[in-house]
Amino acid sequence: DLVRQLRALQPEIAFVALHGPGGEDGTAQELLEILGIPYTGSGVLACQRCMDKVLAKHLFVEAGIPTPEFFAFSQLAFRELGAADALGEIEERLGFPIVIKPSSQGSALGIKFAGSPEDVPGALVSAFAYDTKVLIERHVAGRDLAVGIIERDGEPHVLPIVEAIPLDEPFFDFEARYEIGRTRFVCPADLGNKVAERCAQVALAAYRLLGCRDFARVDLLLAPEGEPTVLEINAIPGLTDTSLLPQAAAAAGIGFDELVATILDNAHQRQDSARR
């Protein structure tokens, strides 16, 4: 099993590139800490905060970081309240359209757009299939932006911003994210200096608030009036050829090998500091 393999290998550094529950929710990180193995990326608490969208949203609100209006239901609370009352609460608090998401999933899994009350039951079924808690969020019409952040010598730096333009859907869902031809990506996004600086400012504030380190991706929606709102933070963003963080790094002149080396260097520096 994994523990036996890790104990046998005793790696100098574990490069964490896992996704979903068990990988980016702090579980793997906690295991590595128990085994005394240094690792890349955010620590246990930051991963837990990022993975739990509802918790992250509450933290954003408390810190004054702009984020779309929302509330959440656990599966138990939804059953106790009843479908009719739950729908009434949604309509009264948020109106329509809304976006319904599992609280703790990545890659846009289980996310559904609900343009009217009739869309809500199916969207809730989809979200509850992935988690026992769902986030219900006011839909913000605007541009989907991904702000990659990478640290060098302990300081986070914002990479060129990526804009995701879905070609046939109202928002950037799982299919639009992963099916070739469903989304066009533009990097750097055509934002203008003032808006780009504001997006970077908001993304860095969210990154620091949740305690991220080494690298992350902050997903924003840019409203028509030019104000960015934070949707979520991915503590372990994808590192494939088509992933957004490597695209952003490439636009900054950072090749994939250099990107990986930089992430590893951060972990090495932490290890060296801990030994002193």
Regions found by a protein language model. Name each.
Residues 6-8, 49-143:
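Active-site nucleotide/adenylate-binding loops and adjacent lid/helix of ATP-dependent enzymes
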Residues 30-39, 116-121, 252-253:
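A glycine- and small-aliphatic-rich helix-loop capping segment at beta-alpha/alpha-beta transitions
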